[in-house]
Amino acid sequence: MEYIKKIALYMSVLLLIIFIGGCGNMKDEQKKEEQTNKTDSKEEQIKKSFAKTLDMYPIKNLEDLYDKEGYRDGEFEKGDKGMWVLYSSIVSEFKGESLKSRGMILKLDRNKRTAKGSYIIRELKEDKNHDVQKNEKKYPVKLVNNKIIPTEDVKNEDLKREIENFKLFSQYGEFKSLNTDRITNISYNPNAPNYSAEYKINDDDNNIKQLKNRFNIKSNKNPKLLFKGAGNIKGSSVGYKEIQIIFNRNKEESVSCIDSIEFKPSEGDYNE
């Protein structure tokens, strides 16, 4: 009997040693991972954030986002599944003319599995006193069976077709062949905090071809992809991340595409 007790005690001690050792190894691995994140320079963190954002593209079926989780922080209430906010627009300004933009914002509520937004036409112009005059029109839209449709009557048939045929850049943009070595001009301001980076694109890139074709953009220069963000580099529901594809930006003309995919806390009562 004493012999059996000694064996049982020995086995208990052995298992305890193995368990403690295993926990120690897990902690060591966690420490190594944390240390890696800490030792990453801000430049590397911004590059990774850039690549992670572009990895979301394309979202061919927007309704897939109802089942996709995003980065959550302390701003989310318990039980809130959050919402995806998509924005895409083309902004242009030519010498002697006003700044114009046409685009869309779409909010996909993961709690209610509904998506609503607006097609927005904006025009900004300076008057003789150099005050900026803003003219904005919004046309409410919703997403049904992965199709965007106006929720109110649009009397202008051309505008109605324009809204119905509009595609967010996130629906067709594709960056699977992204080479992080080509990310340049990285900057970080810890006081704001905000950050930015650039990526060189060739004029024959498929994204560029699609944008030119969809919006009748005439430019033979190699565009650049600008990545901008504010808040925590890892993610922040109170900050933002957006991409800009800049075709031209000079005294004569400025043409660019702005696009963003953000995950935010839901608006209103998400338990309805």
Swiss-Prot record:
It holds the Pfam family DUF576. It is found in: Cell membrane. GO terms for cellular component: plasma membrane. Keywords: Cell membrane, Lipoprotein, Membrane, Palmitate, Signal. The keyword Metal-binding does not apply. InterPro entries: Csa, Csa_sf. A lipid is attached at residue 23 (N-palmitoyl cysteine). Residues 1-22 form the signal peptide. A lipid is attached at residue 23 (S-diacylglycerol cysteine). It is a lipid-anchor. Belongs to the staphylococcal tandem lipoprotein family. NCBIfam families: SA_tandem_lipo. This is Uncharacterized lipoprotein SAR0445. It comes from Staphylococcus aureus (strain MRSA252). The lineage of its organism: Bacteria, Bacillati, Bacillota, Bacilli, Bacillales.
